Regions:
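C-terminal catalytic/substrate-binding lobe primarily of soluble NAD(P)-dependent oxidoreductases
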Residues: 1-231
């Protein structure tokens, strides 16, 4: 609910702007994206630090963050309850009983989750984190996509493995600067990619055989043709 009710920062046209999830400026940022493992998913504007920190360290015109929760029916339930005003914190009187709308909504959503997972035959957790970089190279349009996909976890591996790699780089004295910094300010991405090949063999030892999918890199040319790159 928090992500849908606060003003969402986005770096648009070279400056920080704040959009609202349910209003025209937020709706305009919704888009479908084809993920490895997940397939086509409708994404929504999502508040995150990258929109604020990346433009401070990398010259660019636009930085957005978008996301969703699977299965989509589950996310749609959360979205619709928030849109109906059931995310409020002020108690309301329901037949003589004081009820906090958000407390009711949270309990209802948790109750419905198992039913939705069962009816959609969702199966194991899965997830993907993707970074898309667009611009011009040699005067021609280029798009690069970096994906971290998992068939056995949601955001666990997409969050945990990069953080673990960051800790390794810190121990190896490959983190530049001091203090609190975002990754783009202190880590050479090449170091991270080098370590992925060391992490993946360890992850392959999972008993269920569903290992971390590693980093997938794709290039999209001016014709929209997608080519997978070896790293």
């Amino acid at each position: 609910f928090h992500c849908m009710t606060i003003d969402v920062p986005m770096f648009l046209d070279g400056e920080i702007k704040y959009v609202k999830f349910f209003e025209d400026d937020g709706i305009a940022l919704r888009e479908y994206f084809d993920f490895p493992v997940l397939g086509r998913v409708l994404l929504y504007p999502y508040p995150h630090p990258e929109q604020v920190t990346i433009p401070r360290h990398i010259s660019c015109r636009q930085v957005t963050n978008k996301g969703s929760v699977l299965p989509e029916r589950y996310y749609n339930l959360i979205r619709d309850m928030c849109r109906l005003g059931l995310a409020g914190l002020e108690p309301v009187n329901v037949k003589g009983t004081e009820v906090v709308p958000q407390d009711f909504s949270s309990a209802f959503i948790i109750r419905e989750r198992d039913r939705i997972l069962r009816e959609t035959d969702f199966g194991d957790q899965r997830g993907c984190v993707s970074v898309v970089v667009r611009g011009k190279k040699g005067g021609q349009f280029r798009e690069y996509r970096f994906h971290m996909a998992s068939r056995s976890q949601a955001l666990g591996e997409g969050t945990g493995i990069p953080a673990a790699i960051g800790a390794i780089l810190l121990l190896e004295d490959k983190v530049e600067g001091t203090g609190v910094m975002p990754p783009e300010a202190c880590i050479n991405p090449g170091y991270l990619i080098e370590l992925v090949s060391q992490v993946m063999p360890i992850d392959e030892k999972k008993e269920d055989g569903k290992s971390f999918g590693g980093i997938i890199v794709e290039e999209v040319d001016e014709k929209g043709e997608i080519k997978k790159l070896e790293i």
